[in-house]
């Protein structure tokens, strides 16, 4: 397979604070990744000087994280590694303050979650206890549509690679992920030591009892031994090029001599020069003159591409961040008057009732929305109603809620356009709830502004 033919996939690494996420991820990036030797030697030298020699892989990741948090845009290649079949990007590791928010408004949807579980005595139990972060992260991943999962049982060296401990942990973890919603038969369970790099890329010699992992999905059965093989066995996601265009704007620039240039990530569909696009909820329709990515002109942009595109006769005042561009002839986006969503309250100190009006982060929009009506309280696992018209909901509860945005916003049902159908509820500077949109009451598009070039292009 030629280098260019490899598919790109995104993984998110989840697990308890001390499960060894950084060390494990650092190791993969270190061994198969985009970090050049010079950088690594520099990091190793610094780590040794600070007496952190033992943490060198985690140190690599900490350095990257620190630079990222300081707003230094890190060469994103550093967060990539290669398997025989894929280019893999690690989109975020929890522990990062905004992990939950990032996962939802996410720069990209993860195709697979890697759940790292620590095998140490007491560690495992703490990690998946009732109030554990692990449960929350796994639930989030599942709720937000990350349908594939790999479980890595880490720190096996601390248990002397005990088969009994491994089997005990697998039994417990299977129950745990089943409750979250995953089917254990479709999941690879891999014993590793991220610290020693054992069973990560090459089969470990420390566990002669280990016969390998196997999983069975609709696509068939696959088996392997190492974590790398498990990542390689992720099923390639279908990218939604066949859906109508949805492109949430991240920014709108005014560039001298060129004009107005909206910038954003194509979530679904394709964007081509000559297309007539409508921006919602601004309700402005115009023609796309050119599309570019990394300063190169594109014949077309596809899902996942971060593009800038030049539009005719539209001023920077007409459109803004949070607007969504779509094809004016193919299910164009419109604003939402209200919508119903399944909301899961994660950590709110009090009770949430009708009238609560926090800020919603949905794709690039950031808008206050009112909980107009609590329709029913539901069981998080089954989705079945347990109470109609509850007065309040609290942390741990899930409910179907009717929501009304305080000003026009463009959202979609999760089943139609996933990236525009999930949101984070922010209050008190933290994510207090997450939601998945079930249905949208779309405002009837009144005749908006149609530029001359759009009218002309439409006649063609």
UniProtKB/Swiss-Prot annotation:
Which residues does GTP bind? 15-22, 92-96, 154-157
N6,N6-dimethyllysine modification sites are 3, 317
Report the locations given in the UniProt record: Cytoplasm
Whether GTP-binding counts among this entry's keywords is: yes
Q: Which GO terms describe its molecular function?
A: GTP binding; GTPase activity; translation elongation factor activity
- For the region G1, give the residue spans: 15-22
Region of interest called G3, as start-end residue ranges on this chain: 92-95
- The answer to whether UniProt assigns keyword Nucleotide-binding to this entry is yes
**Region (G5) location:** 193-195
> What CDD domains does its record include?
EF1_alpha (cd01883), EF1_alpha_II (cd03693), EF1_alpha_III (cd03705)
Residues with the modification N6-methyllysine, per the entry, are 3, 31, 317, 391
Q: Where is this region: G2?
A: 71-75
Instruction: Output the Gene Ontology cellular-component terms.
Output: cytoplasm
Q: What is its main location?
A: cytoplasm
Please explain the role this protein plays, according to its UniProt record.
Answer: This protein promotes the GTP-dependent binding of aminoacyl-tRNA to the A-site of ribosomes during protein biosynthesis.
Please name the NCBIfam families in this protein's record.
EF-1_alpha (TIGR00483), PRK12317.1 (NF008969)
Q: Could you identify this protein by its name? A: Elongation factor 1-alpha
Species of the source: Sordaria macrospora
């Amino acid at each position: 397979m030629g280098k260019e033919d490899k598919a790109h996939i995104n993984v998110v690494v989840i697990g308890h604070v001390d499960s060894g996420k950084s060390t494990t991820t650092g190791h993969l990036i270190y061994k198969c990744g985009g970090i050049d030797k010079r950088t690594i030697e520099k990091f190793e030298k610094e780590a040794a000087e600070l007496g952190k020699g033992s943490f060198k892989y985690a140190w690599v990741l900490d350095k990257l994280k620190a630079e990222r948090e300081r707003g230094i845009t890190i060469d994103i290649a550093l967060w990539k590694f290669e398997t025989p079949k894929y280019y893999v990007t690690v989109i975020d590791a929890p522990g990062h303050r905004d992990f939950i928010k990032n996962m939802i408004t996410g720069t990209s949807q993860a195709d697979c979650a890697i759940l790292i579980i620590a095998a140490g005595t007491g560690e495992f139990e703490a990690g998946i206890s009732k109030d554990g972060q692990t449960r929350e992260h796994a639930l989030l991943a599942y709720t937000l549509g990350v349908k594939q999962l790999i479980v890595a049982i880490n720190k096996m060296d601390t248990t002397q690679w005990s088969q009994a401990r491994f089997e005990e942990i697998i039994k417990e973890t299977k129950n745990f992920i089943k409750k979250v919603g995953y089917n254990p038969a479709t999941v690879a369970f891999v014993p590793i030591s991220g610290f020693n790099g054992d069973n990560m890329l090459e089969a470990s010699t420390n566990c002669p009892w280990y016969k390998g992992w196997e999983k069975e999905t609709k696509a068939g059965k696959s088996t392997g031994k190492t974590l790398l093989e498990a990542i390689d066995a992720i099923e390639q996601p279908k990218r939604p090029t066949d859906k109508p265009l949805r492109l949430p704007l991240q920014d709108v620039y005014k560039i001298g001599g060129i004009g107005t240039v909206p910038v954003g990530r194509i979530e679904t569909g394709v964007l081509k020069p000559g297309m007539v696009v409508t921006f919602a909820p601004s309700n402005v329709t115009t023609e796309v003159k050119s599309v570019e990515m990394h300063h190169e002109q594109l014949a077309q942009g596809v899902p996942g591409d971060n593009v800038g595109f030049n539009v005719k006769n539209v001023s920077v005042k007409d459109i803004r961040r949070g607007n969504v561009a779509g094809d004016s002839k193919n299910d164009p986006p419109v604003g939402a008057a209200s919508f119903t969503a399944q909301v899961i309250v994660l950590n709110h100190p009090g009770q949430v009732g009708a009238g609560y009006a926090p800020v919603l982060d949905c794709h690039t929009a950031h808008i206050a929305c009112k909980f107009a009506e609590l329709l029913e309280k539901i069981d998080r696992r089954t989705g079945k109603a347990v109470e109609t018209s509850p007065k309040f909901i609290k942390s741990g509860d899930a409910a179907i809620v009717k929501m009304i945005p305080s000003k026009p916003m463009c959202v979609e049902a999760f089943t139609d356009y996933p990236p525009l159908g999930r949101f984070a509820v922010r209050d008190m500077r933290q994510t207090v709830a997450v939601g998945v949109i079930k249905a949208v009451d779309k405002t009837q598009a009144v005749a908006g502004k149609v530029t001359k070039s759009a009218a002309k292009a439409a006649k063609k």
